[in-house]
Amino acid sequence: MANNSPALTGNSQPQHQAAAAAAQQQQQCGGGGATKPAVSGKQGNVLPLWGNEKTMNLNPMILTNILSSPYFKVQLYELKTYHEVVDEIYFKVTHVEPWEKGSRKTAGQTGMCGGVRGVGTGGIVSTAFCLLYKLFTLKLTRKQVMGLITHTDSPYIRALGFMYIRYTQPPTDLWDWFESFLDDEEDLDVKAGGGCVMTIGEMLRSFLTKLEWFSTLFPRIPVPVQKNIDQQIKTRPRKIKKDGKEGAEEIDRHVERRRSRSPRRSLSPRRSPRRSRSRSHHREGHGSSSFDRELEREKERQRLEREAKEREKERRRSRSIDRGLERRRSRSRERHRSRSRSRDRKGDRRDRDREREKENERGRRRDRDYDKERGNEREKERERSRERSKEQRSRGEVEEKKHKEDKDDRRHRDDKRDSKKEKKHSRSRSRERKHRSRSRSRNAGKRSRSRSKEKSSKHKNESKEKSNKRSRSGSQGRTDSVEKSKKREHSPSKEKSRKRSRSKERSHKRDHSDSKDQSDKHDRRRSQSIEQESQEKQHKNKDETV
């Protein structure tokens, strides 16, 4: 954002000359201060930025803490102009460290864990860096930056101006900006909480030669540019302070200027109307008299502030004493109360323990009774199950007996039926066999009769023939005797074969007929005996005939 003040806008040569004249006049009136480098009109009033145009080349941790800070989001958001931001710096800034005191716990940590390069855990970002980023959001012009670094009211305004240059300007231009201020002897305390006082010149030499600034880093300077800066700093050693009256006078002047520039001006956060704003056109019309008047007013105001601070200190001391007594009394009361409470707690604990023991005993009794009841119920259930099993067994046995009896009855009935059937079959078979045996015996008698008749007839015929043939030769008788012997040999073999066939038939019949009576056997034997007798008779008859 551009500055809204009409006095600081414009790029004409007369305005530059007027600003330079006003700066020289203020330096003459206020004592030895910083010398302003010449600003040529050819450079223009627009100040280009170097590096990242959104982050101002700040450490990401610091930038995120700035953007999330309520101070930056609420209070600094209301400041719209360059002069309002300068007044805020005058009243609020007391150091130029990036973090407030005690907000970052880095004790005992080293390296990257210690947050030396800004990568550790964040803390409360300082007011100075919030205002520095607010200046960056305003997009300052060259004239406004020169007004910051040559400001006479507060060294912290100048320090933030130099820091703005270090973060936003090219490394090749840093020497041109800082060269005329390297011997500036104005003091300021740069550390949060105090304890690190240095001059503006020492701070600028640190900006040019070191990258680290407390727990953050400046933008890196290229190696050739850094070597050039180091050589030029060697040619510009630090000046020794003057001795004698001139040194004393200069020290007195610096003391007066430090008092007038001290940031702890007033308890109110608003800007004092008596304080000069900056080296601008407001001081062109006034002279040394107006500046002296402002100095007198400032001294008076500082004296009143000191008195008010001393009163406040006295009040604080008295309050601290009263608070100490009150604390002691309250501590004694608290001790008494704590003792009584501890006693009450002990009594309550005892009562609670007793009640717990009683409850536990009751619970144990309940558990015992419950276990007993459950045991009795289990025994009853077991007895019931045993009785049921016995009943089931008895029922099963009865059913098995009935089933067996039924089976036996059925088998007996079946056996009776089978026996009756077998008897019927045996009777029918015996009848058939008897009938067959009778028919066979009849046939055998008939055959035997016919055979006997035939034999008798043959015997008669043979006897006749024998008688007729006896007269024949004895040779024929021999042949006949041989033939008869052969016949006799053949006849028993035939009988044996017949017997074998009959025995086979009998065995076959026995296999097929399992239940035959003895009557059948007797019949067979009789028939066989009859047949044998008939055969024997035939053989005898043959022998007799022979």
UniProtKB/Swiss-Prot annotation:
Residue numbers spanned by region Disordered: 1-40, 229-546
Biased composition annotated in UniProt, kind: Basic residues: 256-284, 328-344, 422-450, 496-510
Modified residues (Phosphoserine): 5, 288, 290, 318, 320, 448, 473, 475, 481, 527, 529, 534
Residue list for modification N-acetylalanine: 2
Biased composition (Basic and acidic residues): 243-255, 291-327, 345-421, 451-468, 480-495, 511-546
GO cellular component, one term: precatalytic spliceosome
Coiled coil feature spans: 292-321
Composition-biased stretches (Polar residues): 1-14
Highest taxon, organism lineage: Eukaryota
Residues bearing PTM N6-acetyllysine: 227
Keywords, sorted A to Z: Acetylation, Coiled coil, mRNA processing, mRNA splicing, Nucleus, Phosphoprotein, Spliceosome
Localisation: Nucleus
GO molecular function: RNA binding
Biased composition (Low complexity): 15-28
Physiological role: May be required for pre-mRNA splicing.
PANTHER family: PRE-MRNA-SPLICING FACTOR 38A-RELATED
Protein's recorded name: Pre-mRNA-splicing factor 38B
Species classification: Eukaryota, Metazoa, Chordata, Craniata, Vertebrata
